[in-house]
């Protein structure tokens, strides 16, 4: 799994300290509920009927033993002794008093964890195959590509206020254990006849009240170009997705409404506008390729 750098650790600790200040001002009455609401949501805190709920990010479902023990400590000390793993590989605590929120965020930061982008209309936690890296039917390990997506999407300034939440799943196996057809974007890693690594790209999937499986928008996309292609899709959605109706704001509704023709015209146009970046992303010397080398196995 990806190993946090000194910068990464500094960032999550600063974010925890920032939330402590915001929470203290809210509890003191100097920061109103309307102002505090988006701030707590950006850190994974929901206010539900009986108690707050905290959603903790677990990128592509990987936890170290140290992180798991810290989560258990939070459950024992601040919750009711348990948490809930979600279908999208996050963890939720449902009974933490909000006054304990800052202490909990500090505990998470100690083990390189947080709740950033686990709620709100942004790109959510990147999910993958629960058996990634060990599955016997796996063509390519998807975890390095998940990490690239995680770093790209975290606090992306252009995609912080999308029409609706946006979910991405990646798999590199024959069996779709990541349920990629039911995500806003689904990515299937595989090798073509020439032995080249690439993605089959799906878009427009989703569950909820309108259940629609994703459609294939690119049969084979070279791995060096996958990030600029994903960015183009999200840009089209950010521009053309509905914001007037909460129930029709997901990308699946946009894909269904415009079909392939208009969406196909816009997405390549967006992709061409970023074409200068494609070559740099393909270079082994770029930071994107170094992400994979910074990922290693740990307990």
Language-model region placement:
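Peripheral terminal and linker regions in Fe-S/redox and tRNA-modifying enzymes
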Residues: 1-299
């Amino acid at each position: 799994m990806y190993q946090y750098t000194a910068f990464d650790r500094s960032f999550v600790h600063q974010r925890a300290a920032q939330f402590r200040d915001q929470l203290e001002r809210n509890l003191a009455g100097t920061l109103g509920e309307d102002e505090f609401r988006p701030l707590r949501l950006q850190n994974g805190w929901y206010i539900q009927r009986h108690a707050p709920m905290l959603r903790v990010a677990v990128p592509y479902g990987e936890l170290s033993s140290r992180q798991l023990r810290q989560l258990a400590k939070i459950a024992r000390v601040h919750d009711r002794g348990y948490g809930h793993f979600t279908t999208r590989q996050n963890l939720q605590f449902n009974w933490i008093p909000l006054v304990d929120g800052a202490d909990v965020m500090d505990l998470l930061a100690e083990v390189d964890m947080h709740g950033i982008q686990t709620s709100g209309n942004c790109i959510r936690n990147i999910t993958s195959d629960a058996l990634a890296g060990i599955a016997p039917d796996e063509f390519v390990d998807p975890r390095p590509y998940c990490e690239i997506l995680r770093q790209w999407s975290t606090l992306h300034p252009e995609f912080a206020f999308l029409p609706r939440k946006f979910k991405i799943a990646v798999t590199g196996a024959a069996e779709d254990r990541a349920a990629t057809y039911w995500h806003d974007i689904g990515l299937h890693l595989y090798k073509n006849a020439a032995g080249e690594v690439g993605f089959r790209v799906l878009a427009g999937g989703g569950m909820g009240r309108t259940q629609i499986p994703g459609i294939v928008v690119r049969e084979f996309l070279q791995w060096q170009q996958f990030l600029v292609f994903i960015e183009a899709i999200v840009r089209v959605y950010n521009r053309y997705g509905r914001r007037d109706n909460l129930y029709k704001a997901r990308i699946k509704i946009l894909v269904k409404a415009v079909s392939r023709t208009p969406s196909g015209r816009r997405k390549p146009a967006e992709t061409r506008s970023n074409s200068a970046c494609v070559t740099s992303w393909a270079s082994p010397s770029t930071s994107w390729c170094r992400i994979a080398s910074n990922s290693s196995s740990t307990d």
